[in-house]
Amino acid sequence: HHLKTLAEAYGLTGNLTYAQKAIEELSDWIDHVHAPSLYDEQGNLAPLHFDGLSPWRALEVGIRGYRTWPLIIELLADTPCFTEEFQQKLYQSVQLHCKILYEISPLLWPKADHNHYLMENLGLMALSCLFPEMPDSAKYLSHSQQELDRCMEAQCTPCGGQIEGSPSY
């Protein structure tokens, strides 16, 4: 999450060096850290491709969607570093992130009973709101709202606590 820190440093100082480095590294990450296939060799969705420790674990995809990338966009979108070329690259990656969260996450957490699923749907919701021009944005937003409701039902106790008992949840 150091890219978030770089964006925040730019936001606090106005020093374009931080903005440039954040954009440069995010662009490089998009170019070189490729997502696994959503499908297995038989053409079926492959949720296990997104369940191991990797930058493309569904949880990481969701966290980028609600915690990291929206802040980077908010703080850096008006800088000269946020070029049209970078915007297009980011937009394509956001579409892939949304597709993973929409298609894969429900297969990983069919009962909506895990905090990972909550964060994955927060990511889908945030990205669909941030990019309403995406062709499937309305579908993603509706799905994330429905699934967050399911998360509340499955993960909250009658008194409002989270079932894992963690105050941060």
Task: Tell where the protein language model's regions lie, with residue ranges.
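Aromatic-lined, polymer-binding surfaces characteristic
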Residues: 1-169
